[in-house]
Structure formats: C-alpha cells, structure tokens
Amino acid sequence: ECKGFGKSCVPGKNECCSGLTCSNKHKWCKVLL
C-alpha cells in the first residue's frame, strides 16, 4: 500500500504513491516535478 500526498515517509524507500516522491528535507510525500 502506497503513501499519499503529505504522508510521512522514509527517503529512498519508494513508499509514496505514483507521481509522488519522498522529500529528503521534510520526510513526507510530495508531488514529483
């Protein structure tokens, strides 16, 4: 199960849903630019 926008995550683990990426700075899923 992927994590949605704004959910906490661990950078590099690919936990976020499609189109999202884990922010190294804030440790939450943000929109992939």
From Swiss-Prot:
Record's keyword annotation contains Secreted: yes
Modified residues (Leucine amide): L33
Localization of this protein: Secreted
Tissue specificity remark: Expressed by the venom gland.
Swiss-Prot/TrEMBL keywords: Amidation, Disulfide bond, Ion channel impairing toxin, Neurotoxin, Secreted, Toxin, Voltage-gated sodium channel impairing toxin
GO cellular component assignments: extracellular region
MF GO annotations: ion channel inhibitor activity; sodium channel regulator activity; toxin activity
Disulphide bond pairs: C2-C17, C9-C22, C16-C29
A Pfam short name: Toxin_12
Secreted recorded as keyword: yes
Miscellaneous comment text of the record: Shows low or no activity on hNav1.4/SCN4A (IC(50)=7.7 uM), hNav1.5/SCN5A (IC(50)>10 uM), hNav1.8/SCN10A (IC(50)>10 uM), hCav1.2/CACNA1C, hCav3.1/CACNA1G, hCav3.2CACNA1H, hKv7.1/KCNQ1, Kv11.1/KCNH2/ERG1, and hKir2.1/KCNJ2/IRK1 channels.
Function description: Potently and reversibly inhibits some human voltage-gated sodium channels (Nav1.1/SCN1A (IC(50)=72.0 nM), Nav1.2/SCN2A (IC(50)=75.5 nM), Nav1.6/SCN8A (IC(50)=115.0 nM), Nav1.7/SCN9A (IC(50)=52.7-129.5 nM), Nav1.3/SCN3A (IC(50)=306.6 nM)). The hNav1.7/SCN9A channel inhibition occurs without any change in steady-state inactivation- and conductance-voltage relationships. On adult mouse DRG neurons, this toxin is approximately 1000-fold more efficient to inhibit tetrodotoxin (TTX)-sensitive than TTX-resistant sodium currents. In vivo, this toxin exhibits analgesic effects in mice pain models.
Family: Belongs to the neurotoxin 10 (Hwtx-1) family. 14 (Hntx-1) subfamily.
Assembly and interaction partners: Monomer.
Description of its domains: The presence of a 'disulfide through disulfide knot' structurally defines this protein as a knottin.
Name of the protein in question: Mu-theraphotoxin-Os1a
